[in-house]
Amino acid sequence: MAEYANIIVDIFNEKLDKTFQYRIPEAMKEKLTLGMQVYVPFGKRNIKGYVVELTDEPEFEVAKIKEIIGIVTDSVPIESQLIALAGWMKKNYGATMNHALKTVIPIKKKSNAVEHKSVRLKLTEIEAKSELAEFERKHQKARVRLLSALIENPQMDQSMITQKLNVSGTVIRALETMGIVEVVSERSYRNPVSHLDSKGYHLTLNEEQQSVVDAIERNLDQKIAKTYLIKGVTGSGKTEVYMELIAHMLAHGKQAIVLIPEIALTFQTVMRFYNRFGDRVSIMNSRLSPGERFDQFERAKNGDVDIMIGPRSALFTPFSKLGLIIIDEEHESSYKSETLPRYHARETAIERAGMCGASVVLGSATPSVESYYKAKTGEYELLELKHRVAEKPLPKVEVVDLREELKAGNRSILSVRLQELMEDRLKKGQQMMLFINRRGVAGFVSCRACGHVIKCPHCDVSLSQHVTRQHPEGKMVCHYCGYEIPMPKTCPACGSRYISGFKAGTQKIEMIVKERFPQARVLRMDMDTTRNKEGYEQILSAFANQEADILIGTQMIVKGHDFPNVTLVGVLAADLSLYVSDYHAAERTFQLLTQAAGRAGRGSEPGEVVIQTYQPDHYSVQAAKEQDYEAFYEQEMEYRRMLLYPPVWNMLVILCASKWEQTAYDSAKLLVQEIDTWQENIKAAMERVGEDFKKKRVFPVGPADPAVAKVNDIYKKVIYIKTKDYQTLVELKDRLEHYMRDNRAFKDTVVQFDFNPMSGF
C-alpha cells in the first residue's frame, strides 16, 4: 500500500497547476484509490484535491509532508473518473499529468455567469394598492408604473421593466429596500441548440437496421459491455441505428455521447438528433464561446441533458450515468490529437467506457484498418449494413485518366467527361459537389524559368497562393505558422516574370467553374469561408435549401452530409492524398474517395461520380471505384505486414524539437543510445530466466528529418520505433522519461511521444 499521494488541489490558479504531496493516514490506506477527491490542508485552510498518483517515494523531508484530512464522501463520482482517465492517458500517451488533466477537464475555470433577473412583488394585492395610492399622491411616476405593472403580473423580467416601463435600477432598489419587491437572480445556461425546432421525428428501421439494433440491445439488456464496429455502406442509415440505441439507453436512465469527426457534421447531425430527442441534446465544439462551453459542461453535470454531440473533446463530458459512446466516421484522423497528450479518441473512449460499464459503438462505411483488424480478430464485434435505405443503388463511379486529358489538349482541371455531366445536371436542375483536398488558389508558386519555389522563411514548406478582397492580386500564405507576403510579380531568385501557381485549390476551382458555367450558382466551403461561428451552418443550409447548384470544397464537404438533390460528385485530384510521406496515405485516399462518392444519389435520382487521377491503376483508386472495402483491406494489410506497420505491429514516434538543429539531432542521438542500452539490459535479464526476447525486441530507426523538418523556426528530428507488443513501447517511454528528467543535455529540447501516429510529424 502506498505511503504518499500526489494531489492536484482544486484551485483555479495556473501557478498551482501542479501536484502537491501528502501523507496517507494509516486508516485511509486501504480506501484511497486513484482519482478520489480528498480534503487536504493548504496554507491556512482546508480544500479539496484530486488524487492523481500513489507512491512510496517521498519528494520532500518526511517531517514536512502534511497529512490528508479525509475523503470527500459527497463528491460527484464522474470527476474522480475523469481524473483516473487522465492518469491512464498520461501513462499511455506520454505527457505530464497537467496536460492530461487539462484535456479531460478542459473547463477548469468558471465562466462569468449569465444571470437572469426578475422582480417579484412581496405584498398582497390590498397592501400593494395602498402603497400605490401613496406613490400617486406624491407624484412618484416611475414607482407608480412599476407597482401598477406588478399588481397585474406579480413577477416580471427586470430587463422588460427597465426597457418597456422606463424604470431605472435605482427605483427598483428603492422598492426592494422598502420591502415591497425582491429581485430574484437565477443562473441562465446558454443552449447552442435552443434555436432548433423539435418535431419528435422518428423513422421506422428496415430489417437490416433492426437486426443490428437487436444484436446490440440484447447485450445491453444483459449488462454486457462491448465494443461494436458497424460497417455500413454510405447511405445505409447508421444514424438511425445510433438514435434507436440512444433511445434504448435513455429509457433505462442512461446517457450517451456521440462523437463526430469535424464541426462540419454538427449542423446536420444535431438537427436529426434534436428532431428526435428535443432539448435533451446539446453540442460541444471548439467554435462555442468559453461561456457556452462552460454552460454545456454544467448542464451535463447537473443532468439537464442526456446526449452530448461533438468532436473528440465531447468524450470528456461529465455524465454520471454514461451508458453508451458512439464514434461516427470512426476512421477519421481528426480523432487523434496532434497536441499533448497525443491520445486517440477511439482508444480513450473504450477505456472510459470500461471504467463505468458503458458500451462503445464505432461506425463507418470505410473503417480504419486498425479497427477492422480488431473486428476480424474478435476484439470488437462486427455488425454490417450492406444496403442503402429504401434499396437505393450505390452511385456509378467513373475514373478519368488526367494523363489522357492532357494528351487530348485539355489543360483544364475539369475533365471533358466531368464538364459534360455538370452541363447535364444544370439543365435538369440537380445539384453537384466538387471535391479537392486543398485550400487556396495554388498549392505552391514556382518560377518556370529557374524552378525556384517560394517557401516560408520560418518553416520547411512552400507558401500557398490565396486571393481575397483585400488582396485581389493574391498573397502568399504559410498554412503552418500563418506567415504571409504579397504575391510577387517577379521571381525572387532570378527576376523572371514567369512565376505562377501550380495545383489548383478551392478558390481557383471556384473561379474556373464560374467562368465555365456562368449561369451556375456556386458555393465554396473550406476553412477560409467558415472561419466565423455560423459559417458551416450558413453554407450547408443554403445548399440544402437548393440556393446553389454547385458546392466546391475540401474534405469537410464529404463528411456525412445528406443532400437528396445531389446526383453528381466530382473528385478533381484523387492523387493529392497519395503524395504524402505517411503509411496511411493509401487508406486515406480510399476513404476520401468512397466517402465523396457516397454523397451522390441519396435521393430519388441515381448518382454518378467522376474520379480524376494521374494514377488510375492504384489499388486505392480501383477499390474506391468498385466500392470494394474488402479488396482494399486485403491489399493494404499485405503492405502493412511486409513493412511492419500497425495494426500488425505497433509504432512509437519520438519527436525532438529545438531552436537549434544540432541540439535537436544530439538529443535524438542520446535517446537512440539509451534505447539500445535499455534493450541490451532487457535481453540479458530475459535470457537469464529463460524467456524469449523476441516479443520485447524493438527496432529503432533514426534520428531522421520528418516530412516538415522546420516549423516556425523550430527544428525537428524524429526516431521511429517498431515492435509487436504495445506495452513494451509504454515501458520504453517510461524509461526515456526517467532518463531525461534530470539530464541537462535536454534543457533546450522539447521531446514528445506519439503512439501509432495518424500522420507524419
Task: Label each PLM-derived region with a short phrase.
Residues 1-364, 376-392, 720, 727-734, ...:
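Accessory, non-ATPase domains that flank or precede helicase/AAA+ motor cores in DNA-metabolism machines
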Residues 199-206, 210, 214, 223-665, ...:
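Inter-lobe coupling/hinge segments of SF2-like helicase ATPases
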Residues 678-706, 747-756:
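Short beta-strand elements
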